[in-house]
């Protein structure tokens, strides 16, 4: 049954959520004197904790779980098809999104900024991958995006690679990720025994990705979910 938590319990939950660690003395003092549950005290403590270096744990752990960034180190696109991909680019992908998440958090921006932001963070390696000129050095800096297709999370290399196969992009994986992670509306499991897409047209020509996806949308069993994705 629901119950009102104590100030000490509140301090513990707040600290482990924001810092992934135990409360510090200042937070414990507010809990012990019974004022932590007061809205103005709770807000002040939360803002103080978010401004602390220990809040880096929130970026790493929360973004890692919510956006699947913790899976980025295991990404291995096909090296024959993507010979330019390597450890430096993989690490830059992850750091870009972590810095982006951190900026929205510390600047108290709206949640829609995750999808619409006209800025990102790049170093020389990542800028070269994105085709952005005049960026030099390994350090990351904030830039304004000229290319609208790069706006927000859905333009980040980390998210695009996480929602692709090793050999090609995948609108289905990407749509599923959006439904699950951004809209909290996961699609139902696919029906059993769904055949692989026919990647060759009747005249022997390779199908475009749009043509291949039309096969699923034309199948009534698959269409309801694939129209969403």
Feature annotation, model-predicted:
Residues 1, 127, 142-229:
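Sequence context surrounding c-type heme c attachment/ligation sites in exported
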Residues 1-12, 23-106, 113, 163:
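Long, ordered, helix-rich scaffold segments
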Residues 16-20, 24, 33, 52, ...:
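Short, well-ordered loop/turn and helix-capping segments at boundaries between secondary-structure elements
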Residues 118-121, 133-134, 197, 229:
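Active/binding-pocket-proximal capping segment
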């Amino acid at each position: 049954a629901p119950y009102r938590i104590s100030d000490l319990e509140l301090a513990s939950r707040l600290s482990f959520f924001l810092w992934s660690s135990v409360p510090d003395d200042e937070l414990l003092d507010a809990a012990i004197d019974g004022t932590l549950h007061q809205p103005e005290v709770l807000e002040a403590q939360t803002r103080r904790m978010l401004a602390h270096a220990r809040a880096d744990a929130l970026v790493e752990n929360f973004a890692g779980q919510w956006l699947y960034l913790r899976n980025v180190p295991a990404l291995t696109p096909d090296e024959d098809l993507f010979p330019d991909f390597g450890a430096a680019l993989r690490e830059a992908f992850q750091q870009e999104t972590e810095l982006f998440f951190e900026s929205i958090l510390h600047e108290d921006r709206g949640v829609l900024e995750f999808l619409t932001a006209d800025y990102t963070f790049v170093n020389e390696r990542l800028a070269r991958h994105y085709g952005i000129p005049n960026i030099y050095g390994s350090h990351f800096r904030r830039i304004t995006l000229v290319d609208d297709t790069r706006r927000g999370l859905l333009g980040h290399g980390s998210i695009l690679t996480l929602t692709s196969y090793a050999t090609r992009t995948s609108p289905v994986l990407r749509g599923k990720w959006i439904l699950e992670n951004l809209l909290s509306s996961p699609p139902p499991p696919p029906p059993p025994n769904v055949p692989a897409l026919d990647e060759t047209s009747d005249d022997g020509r390779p199908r475009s990705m749009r043509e291949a996806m039309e096969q699923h949308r034309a199948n009534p069993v698959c269409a309801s979910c694939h129209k969403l994705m």
